[in-house]
């Protein structure tokens, strides 16, 4: 199969904008659409019509907020003329059920759907250091590898079925959410005993309790007071809710997941909208005060 001749990109938000910017630096023409005008990166064609992206591109990347929006866009695309043979690569985090629904809609119209969420947050997207979790034909992954490598540091093929990419992404985000909340609680325990935060981090970083929160979020986002990891608390809470929903459907253990979901729901309720998820530390800190 030949490489795509034109790439489309739909959704230029927190993650989509930097990913599209790296694609625009490549050799394949890029056409972008977002409901907010003016977000297209330098080097890309911007259009105010989704239909123009679909008409001009043979591969279209999606980076959208949730499954409801992804499936609305999928239905709109499927109803357009001359879409057979096009490839839709959805990099949104929407859960297995929504991915399967989008796949059914688009494949019925003769298109190929790839379930390919990404991990690494906005900071990773800005550095092209994110990971793409690909569930779909390996041949399509190989055909698009030169595009993927423009904005991803890692690419994993996790299966051929829609929903498998979402499962891996959600379990990853659940682990990240758990590490962030548990580390915040543990650090507060150390602080209560008069140990300074940097010392706690230095010890744990080279011990068995190390994790990404201790390694990155605390020294770079919390100790500095910047709280700028680039991922909103409400979005992480959404992912934790999705994880718990599909754990229940799968019938696997949910003892820890249920409690973590309660914590992040409380965190979202305690913070203003679009607060960085690292501010979980501040929420828990306030709850430890007399």
Where are these regions (language model features)?
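NAD(P)+-binding Rossmann beta1-loop-alpha1 motif at the extreme N-terminus of oxidoreductases
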Residues: 1-63, 91, 122
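Rossmann-fold NAD(P) dinucleotide-binding segment
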Residues: 50-112
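Active-site-proximal catalytic alpha-helix in oxidoreductases
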Residues: 127-128, 132-135, 156, 162-193, ...
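NAD(P)-dependent dehydrogenase/reductase Rossmann-like domain
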Residues: 270-290
